[in-house]
């Protein structure tokens, strides 16, 4: 297996995790309590949930890297376009549909949507850097 695929995945996962931290953890942090009944109570299981979320970031990065490699979209232009298309197909519609039916502050939804776009673009940049 090409070692560059692994490096692209690891770098993409780290960058994606930083995007998650900023857009889902820092921006509009106080707005999460506009509808506190939506969120799980207590901080007891947060560490476990954070570890699982980081594992998902690794899966996201790995899947993106492999898809870009398989589709021969490993240059910057191709990888960034692929990231934007994935965002339009997956995270954006899901987040907007959730906002229609779940009481989530609109700024939180916007932050999560922007975070997903940035995460995918960063993974794309890591992919192009390592494989392009």
Task: Name each region found by the language model.
Residues 1-132:
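Juxtamembrane/disordered regions of integral membrane proteins
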